[in-house]
């Protein structure tokens, strides 16, 4: 197989076709774009005025072992994303950066209501929710066409906010399902803000036969994952690091699998893993201690993601490199991650099948041929599951 040294080569990893399912639009800005948008908006509160220094500031602020502290930097990115022009630009650049990193399909999420404050320094009123959605979708549509990428937009509600607002955002997501909105999410601090409080929003989404992903098991235990699945009907779980608490482990071996952990395994519930981010927020103690490796050995359907490229100073290729370095992933494992993600995407079934064969398996096979590598070994976990 491909040697570990080669698999840690970012240039090689960028050539691998990848699929991203868990990234926040307001956490994926380019540092120089933040500076330019701040100048245009008259926003003078950025802590640094040099792109490299600003990037270091965001990373230093995020890498503090706490989700609330990790989220502090978002007030700056959100502040400069208050005009239609800014939103369209950020969305376009997001997919452009995906293309440069070898991503062939990406789902990006954001909370539209956070972008309705306007530009008080210029006396400009805030955008309406529809204007926010249209601006982001315009940027994604243009970039998808320019860079030949598949994409989908996910609307986020926030756990700490009024459930009535969550219902309004769910209705907004459904209203744009034909324009590229593919799913609904619940994000934010889990402790003290159970997903069940937002049940009306999820009941509405389920009645509309729409897709659901929920941040769960990041800063709270298995109960949060259980609520996301059994109360709210989540089709995917964001992060899921604390699912490990439903596994009994002795001397590195799993001796008992709890009913929740077994449910996710049996039902092939995708888990959106974010290695770097989970260490930065304290959801995992270190990269090597992240449960990703254990989940992989047990056969869970895993996808690999960045969460927030700016805050965690990462790319999806870098996350693949970390999976190789800290969890022993080989080229077959990396291909499985891409296939799992495309299987789990909120795109229509026929499109997922086409992209798995044409945009993932075919390029991987060509890379193997170019490097004189043997064909990919079959994986039992890739039995047809839809």
Regions found by a protein language model. Give the residues of each.
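Metal-cofactor-binding active-site regions of metalloenzymes
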Residues: 1-210, 218-236, 242-386
């Amino acid at each position: 197989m491909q040697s570990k040294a080669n698999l840690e080569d970012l240039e090689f990893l960028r050539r691998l076709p990848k699929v991203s399912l868990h990234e926040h639009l307001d956490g994926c800005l380019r540092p120089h774009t933040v500076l330019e948008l701040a100048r245009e908006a008259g926003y003078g509160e950025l802590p640094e005025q040099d792109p490299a220094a600003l990037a270091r500031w965001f990373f230093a602020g995020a890498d503090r072992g706490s989700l609330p502290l990790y989220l502090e930097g978002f007030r700056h990115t959100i502040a400069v994303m208050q005009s239609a022009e800014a939103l369209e630009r950020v969305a376009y650049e997001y997919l452009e950066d995906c293309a440069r990193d070898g991503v062939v399909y990406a789902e990006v999420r954001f909370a539209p209501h956070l972008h309705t404050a306007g530009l008080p320094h210029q006396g400009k009123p805030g955008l309406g929710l529809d204007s926010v959605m249209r601006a982001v979708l315009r940027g994604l549509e243009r970039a998808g066409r320019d860079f030949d990428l598949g994409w989908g937009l996910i609307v986020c509600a926030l756990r700490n906010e009024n459930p009535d607002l969550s219902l309004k955002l769910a209705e907004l997501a459904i209203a744009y399902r034909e324009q590229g909105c593919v799913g609904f999410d619940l994000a934010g601090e889990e402790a003290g803000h159970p997903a069940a409080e937002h049940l009306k929003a999820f009941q509405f989404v389920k009645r509309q036969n729409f897709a659901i992903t929920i941040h769960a098991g990041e800063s709270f235990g298995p109960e949060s994952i259980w609520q996301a699945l059994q109360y709210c009907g989540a089709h995917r779980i964001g992060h899921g690091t604390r699912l490990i608490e439903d596994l009994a482990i002795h001397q590195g071996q799993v001796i008992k699998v709890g009913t929740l952990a077994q449910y996710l395994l049996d039902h092939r519930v995708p888990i959106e893993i974010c290695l770097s981010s989970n260490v930065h927020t304290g959801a995992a103690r270190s990269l090597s201690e992240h449960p990703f490796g254990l989940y992989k050995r047990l056969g869970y359907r895993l996808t690999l993601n960045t969460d927030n490229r700016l805050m965690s100073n990462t790319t999806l290729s870098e996350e693949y490199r970390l999976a190789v370095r800290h969890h022993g992933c080989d080229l077959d494992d990396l291909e499985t991650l891409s296939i799992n993600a495309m299987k789990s995407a909120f795109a229509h079934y026929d499109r997922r099948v086409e992209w798995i064969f044409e945009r993932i398996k075919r390029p991987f096979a060509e890379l193997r041929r170019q490097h004189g590598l043997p064909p990919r070994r079959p994986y039992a976990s890739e039995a047809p599951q839809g």
